[in-house]
From Swiss-Prot:
Keyword entries, A-Z: Cell inner membrane, Cell membrane, Cytoplasm, Membrane
Location relative to the cell: Cytoplasm; Cell inner membrane
GO cellular component: cytoplasm; plasma membrane
Main location: cytoplasm
Source organism superkingdom: Bacteria
Gene name of the record: hflD
Family listed: Belongs to the HflD family.
Name of this chain's protein: High frequency lysogenization protein HflD homolog
Gene3D superfamilies: HflD-like
Entry-linked NCBIfam families: PRK00218.1-2
Membrane topology: Peripheral membrane protein
Length: 200
């Protein structure tokens, strides 16, 4: 277990936390939204940290990760389900070359639109959400989102959630690229906790 694997885990936890906020309260941290959505277009970063413009931007994610792993801490079942769902969906994606190629093309299209719009612009968020719906959702492994029905019916809420889940897939890809394995949760918990504590 290394720092980059824990960083990717923290990013997935931060995505899960933002999905919760949007689904349950209809709001989100705009800075976190920008950082997480920007990670999607970081397809050739100079370093893993560059995906998130530095690990300082993931402090909430590290805190959330610690809360899930620390002894005696109250676990958030939704966070666990979201992160597990992202990992499962990423595995399905990595096994499908056609979907991977389509994902790359669609992300390139979004990158070009950023010459005119911010990553958090509603039209860009809608574009990212559409990528999730048309490229990732057909792979199965649907991620169930929990929230207020009146919020989940709103198009903007749906778009933000799907765009955030796409960002979560980006972090799940990084987790795998850095050598992350599911067994690390059982055999490297102390190491994960130590690294996360050093980041907050």
């Amino acid at each position: 277990m290394n720092q980059h694997q824990v960083m990717a885990l923290a990013a997935m936890c931060q995505v899960a936390k933002q999905v919760q906020k949007v689904a349950q309260y209809g709001n989100n941290n705009e800075h976190d939204l920008e950082i997480l959505l920007s990670s999607i277009i970081q397809t050739s970063p100079a370093s893993p940290e560059d995906v998130y413009q530095g690990t300082d931007n993931l402090r909430d994610g590290y805190k959330t990760l610690l809360a899930q792993l620390s002894a005696g801490a109250q676990k958030d079942v939704e966070i666990v389900k979201y992160v597990g769902g992202l990992m499962q969906l990423e595995r399905a994606l990595s096994a499908n070359d056609k979907s991977l190629n389509e994902l790359g093309k669609r992300i390139d299209d979004i990158h070009r639109r950023l010459d005119h719009f911010a990553i958090t612009d509603e039209s860009v968020v809608a574009g990212l959400a559409d990528i999730y719906s048309t490229v990732l959702s057909p792979l199965g492994h649907r991620i169930q989102v929990y929230g207020k029905p009146e919020l989940l019916k709103q198009q903007l809420t749906q778009n933000k959630i799907r765009a955030l889940l796409l960002a979560g897939i980006r972090s799940a890809v990084l987790w795998r690229q850095m050598g992350g394995k599911r067994r690390h949760f059982f055999f490297a918990k102390r190491k994960i906790i130590a690294i996360a504590k050093a980041k907050i």
